Regions:
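Short, positively charged loop/turn segments that connect secondary-structure elements
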Residues: 97-114, 123
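Short Lys/Arg-enriched helix C-cap and helix-to-coil transition segments
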Residues: 121-128
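Terminal helix-turn-helix DNA-binding modules in bacterial transcription factors
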Residues: 117-118
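Short glycine-rich loop/turn motifs that provide flexible caps or phosphate-binding loops at active sites
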Residues: 10, 53, 66, 83, ...
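…primarily DNA-binding HTH/wHTH and HhH modules…
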Residues: 131-161
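Short Gly/charged-rich anion-binding patches and loops
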Residues: 73, 109, 144
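Basic nucleic-acid-binding alpha-helical/helix-turn surface characteristic of O6-alkylguanine DNA
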Residues: 1-105, 151-161
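Short glycine/proline- and charge-enriched loop/turn segments
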Residues: 27-30, 129, 142
Length: 161
């Protein structure tokens, strides 16, 4: 595994790559290992440069997410949420219920899967909010979630009523 740090407006970001895929992107983590940059990490840093300049870059970085089948499905849905838009945990729970052929699905189960996302920002877990648009649960702190959403043009006053 290769690790390196990226300094961003939301704090230090730790990037992890297996040499072929991005396998981790964590906000606020320090790297105690020797830094090693490969082509995936270099591509990710360029993507982050573009994102933090206010652009909406296409995600063309190979990502490998390790998790349960349920988590994988939730993370796939996260990747479909457009830049600057939000979905509620309930929205994703309803979509998961349809995918799994169930009558309903727990928004809490979805929230737990969202919270385990190992590649934040690129797999945009910050775009998931509470039922009425309230900012809830973000592994890196609600302030960072709010910053990322505002950076993408979202305003809480325009949220779900």
């Amino acid at each position: 595994m290769n690790f390196t740090e990226y300094i961003s407006p939301v704090g230090n970001i730790l990037l992890q790559s297996d040499g072929e895929h991005l396998t981790g992107l964590w906000i606020g983590r320090e790297n105690s290992r020797e830094q090693a940059e490969d082509s995936v990490i270099k591509k990710t840093k360029l993507w982050l440069d573009s994102y933090f300049r206010g652009e909406n870059p296409a995600v063309e970085i190979p990502i490998k997410l390790h998790g349960t089948e349920f988590q994988q499905q939730v993370w796939k849905i996260l990747q479909e949420i457009p830049y600057g838009q939000i979905r509620t945990y309930g929205d994703i729970a309803r979509e998961m219920a349809l995918l799994l052929g169930k009558e309903k699905m727990s928004a809490q189960a979805v929230g737990q899967a969202v919270g385990k996302n190992p590649v934040s920002i690129l797999v945009p877990c910050h775009r998931v909010v509470g039922t009425k648009g309230q900012l809830t649960g973000y592994a890196w702190g609600v302030e960072k979630k709010q910053w990322l959403l505002r950076h993408e043009g979202w305003r809480q006053e325009n949220s779900i009523k």
